[in-house]
Amino acid sequence: MCGYYGNYYGGRGYGCCGYGGLGYGYGGLGCGLGSYYGCGYRRLGCGYGCGYGYGYGSRSLCGCGYGYGSGYGSGFGYYY
């Protein structure tokens, strides 16, 4: 749910932006534009090199803590 519904629809209230990948706006950085392309937990750098339709998050790319994917809905257990 997180990847597809969270990021494809912008991550607002759908489960992928900010605090623990639930809700939205915790810390605010990267939410909206960031979470639309990127992933959830880490609020810094999400959307800039993480996801962008590739389907997987990566801490090495953008520091997304739990590796929530992109609009494709991939990446629940991918903790890189």
Curated annotation (Swiss-Prot):
GO terms for biological process: keratinization. Interacts with hair keratins. This is Keratin-associated protein 6-1. Signal peptide: none annotated. Keywords: Keratin. InterPro entries: KAP6. Belongs to the KRTAP type 6 family. The gene is KRTAP6-1. The lineage of its organism: Eukaryota, Metazoa, Chordata, Craniata, Vertebrata. GO terms for cellular component: intermediate filament. In the hair cortex, hair keratin intermediate filaments are embedded in an interfilamentous matrix, consisting of hair keratin-associated proteins (KRTAP), which are essential for the formation of a rigid and resistant hair shaft through their extensive disulfide bond cross-linking with abundant cysteine residues of hair keratins. The matrix proteins include the high-sulfur and high-glycine-tyrosine keratins.
